[in-house]
UniProtKB/Swiss-Prot annotation:
Entries under InterPro entries matching the protein: GDSL, GDSL_lipolytic_enzyme, Lipase_GDSL_AS, SGNH_hydro_sf, SGNH_plant_lipase-like
Signal peptide as annotated in the record: 1-22
Catalytic activity, EC: 3.1.1.-
Glycosylation site list: 25
Protein name (Swiss-Prot/TrEMBL): GDSL esterase/lipase At3g14820
Record GO biological process: lipid catabolic process
Family: Belongs to the 'GDSL' lipolytic enzyme family.
Protein species of origin: Arabidopsis thaliana (Mouse-ear cress)
Predominant place of localization: secreted
PROSITE patterns: LIPASE_GDSL_SER
GO MF annotation terms: lipase activity
Enzyme class: hydrolase
Length: 351
């Protein structure tokens, strides 16, 4: 097993044991969770920027504490919240661009992810959202604020002890590829994304982040909207898109292996593809009734403004669906995915 992976996993799961202790007054080993990426992790950064890609209105958030639509692209919590809570850091994490963010809120981490973003800079331009490069600029601003309010030692502590997660590529693969298809075929575009993702990791490491988890692409061809657009009358998964995601994952994993030898950071490749695909292919095994349609509206195409409080046919119980809208999983699915990943890594460590 790679020494970087052993180090990351030992560090990660010692924290899991520590934070699951009954003695909640013990100082948490991980001070903060800091996340970059897209709508899978976004907790509301798009709310106050000029983009159509928003979810701060019902029925989004209907299963969130207080039934508040916060700008999370789901019925409830998203993985960044679930991971933060699992690590004993916080029950939810704020968006960095949130208007109510106070200096003390910065200490447990923030979310820089912006729904609609991607590794390809064209992706964020097309959707008018926060690009990955701008997310890094905001991160530098965040570090400056930590230094201003809490001192240089606190900055070093957060950089060395926090978890940094990067979750992107879905919008690139599902949307921007069609614009780029004049320049690239599917495989070469996936490889272009790997170059961009690798450069992002290098820059994040150069800024001092020591513990970085990089998520794989997901089976985007099985998203309800992609089934509707490309799956034919039976709305099957669009395998050409899934194969592009698999090629991206393979090349990204290899690139990360190379980066582990070059960078001082601990790096781990988190493969979520098979986990989500198994839930989609075998929904009843996980307590779901519907996997090919979202809960909102008909479940076939509704997303963002098309998924609103007036949208007819919205299901009464989102926990019966793998997806909440035509692109994003329900909170129940996110909970299952997150805990399956934790169990997977724990088992891997014990081999």
């Amino acid at each position: 097993m790679d020494l970087h992976l052993i180090g990351f996993l030992l560090w990660f799961f010692v924290v899991q044991v520590t934070t699951s202790s009954a003695h909640r007054n013990i100082t948490t080993t991980i001070p903060a969770l800091i996340v970059f990426g897209d709508s899978i992790m976004d907790t509301g950064n798009n709310n106050d920027i000029p983009t159509l890609l928003k979810s701060n209105f019902p029925p989004y958030g209907r299963d969130f504490p207080g039934a508040i639509p916060t700008g999370r692209f789901s019925d409830g919590k998203v993985p960044s919240d679930i991971i933060a809570e699992s690590l004993g850091i916080a029950k939810t994490l704020p968006p960095y661009l949130g208007s109510n963010l106070k200096p003390h809120d910065l200490l447990k981490g923030v979310i820089f992810a912006s729904g609609g973003s991607g590794y390809d800079p064209l992706t964020s331009t097309l959707l008018s959202v926060v690009s990955m490069s701008d997310q890094l600029k905001y991160f530098q601003e965040y570090l400056a604020k930590i230094k201003q309010h809490f001192g240089e030692e606190k900055v070093k502590f957060i950089l060395e002890k926090s978890v940094f997660l990067v979750v992107s590529s879905s919008n690139d693969l599902a949307e921007t590829y069609w614009v780029r298809s004049v320049e690239y075929d599917r495989n070469s575009y996936a490889e272009y994304l790997v170059e961009l993702a690798s450069e992002f990791i290098k820059e994040l490491s150069e800024l001092g982040a020591k513990n970085i988890g990089l998520f794989s692409g997901v089976p985007v061809g099985c998203l309800p909207a992609q089934r509707t657009l490309f799956g034919g009358f039976e709305r099957k998964c669009y395998e050409k898109l899934n194969n592009m995601a698999l090629h991206f994952n393979s090349k990204l994993s290899s690139s990360l292996d190379t980066l582990k030898k070059e960078l001082p950071s601990r790096l781990i490749f988190i493969d979520v593809y098979d986990t989500l695909l198994d839930i989609i292919k075998n929904p009843t095994n996980y307590g779901f009734k519907v996997a090919d349609k979202g809960c909102c509206g008909t479940g076939k195409i509704e997303l963002m403004e098309l998924c609103n409080k007036f949208t007819p046919f919205t299901c009464s119980d989102a926990s019966t669906h793998v997806f909440f809208d035509s692109y994003h999983p329900s909170e129940k699915a996110y909970q299952i995915i997150t805990h399956k990943l934790l169990a997977k890594y724990r088992k891997y460590l014990n081999t």
